[in-house]
């Protein structure tokens, strides 16, 4: 059995299929894991999500910010933007089935000895705490409180974690760390506006450059296309190489650590 983790697909189904063909993916014995942002921006969001759903137990994913945005639009608390490519999903006859399936996906999951998350895991949380906090959001998304969650999901505050945070502020902070984070300070303060490492100012630096205080887990993440998949440090695997922006689509096999990429299709 081979286990593959793939970066941000964002509705680009053709390169995903090409990647799976390259590695001779067999849905009867292999597993594909998406690091989030399964849909949006690319040309085939509906076909992509249907394809992954049809893989059944051969597919797992964590939710990314674009996936959560779709669910917010589905709840009627947000409108699709000019750059969004989710209208086909919103009009699909099976849209309720799609939304139900998407709401059941976690924000953090473990496969083999790897932890997969969309944006990252802040150094101020140990791994047990990260899973516990991620579960708080997942449980809310699957509950009758989900509309309220999505109404209050957007925003950059609170910008630093406190254990005494409650309600919508607590859930927003957890969501921002796991699905939007790029830079943070030593204290865990988030800086959510900057994407370029060259322009970030102190005290902020990439979340993965902070000491993890004895944590040694392997982390696979997406979200940050500007990194271009360059090495981020030991046991860290950046998978978003920005296919939707002209880069390749990247996939890693978790046993061999072999990386396979699909360049832009013409």
Question: Where would I find each of the regions flagged by the language model?
Answer:
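Active-site environment of divalent metal-dependent phosphoester hydrolases
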Residues: 10-14, 40-42, 66-72, 124, ...
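Active-site neighborhood of divalent metal-dependent phosphoester bond hydrolases
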Residues: 46-49, 54-169
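Residue-level marker for buried hydrophobic side chains located in beta-strands
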Residues: 5, 32-34, 61-62, 115, ...
């Amino acid at each position: 059995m081979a286990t593959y983790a793939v970066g941000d697909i964002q509705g680009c189904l053709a390169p995903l299929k090409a990647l799976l063909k390259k590695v001779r993916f067999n849905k009867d014995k292999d597993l594909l894991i998406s690091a989030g942002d399964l849909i949006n921006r690319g040309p085939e969001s509906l076909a992509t999500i249907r394809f992954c759903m049809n893989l059944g137990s051969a597919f797992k994913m964590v939710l990314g910010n674009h996936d959560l945005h779709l669910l917010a639009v589905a709840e009627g608390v947000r409108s699709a933007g000019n750059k969004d490519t989710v209208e086909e999903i919103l009009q699909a006859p099976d849209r309720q089935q799609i939304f139900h399936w998407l709401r059941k996906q976690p924000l953090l999951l473990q496969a083999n000895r790897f932890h997969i998350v969309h944006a990252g895991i802040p150094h101020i949380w140990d791994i047990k705490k990260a899973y516990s906090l991620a579960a708080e959001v997942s449980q809310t998304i699957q509950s009758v409180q989900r509309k309220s969650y999505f109404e209050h999901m957007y925003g950059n505050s609170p910008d630093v974690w406190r254990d005494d945070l409650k309600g919508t502020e607590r859930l927003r902070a957890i969501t921002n760390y796991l699905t939007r984070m790029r830079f943070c300070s030593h204290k865990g303060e988030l800086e959510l506006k900057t994407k370029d490492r060259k322009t970030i100012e102190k005290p902020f630096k990439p979340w993965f450059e902070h000491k993890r205080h004895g944590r040694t887990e392997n982390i696979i993440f997406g979200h940050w296309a500007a990194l271009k998949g360059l090495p981020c440090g030991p046991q860290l695997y950046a998978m978003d190489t920005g296919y939707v922006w002209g880069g390749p689509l990247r996939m890693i096999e978790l046993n061999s650590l072999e990386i396979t990429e699909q360049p832009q299709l013409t």
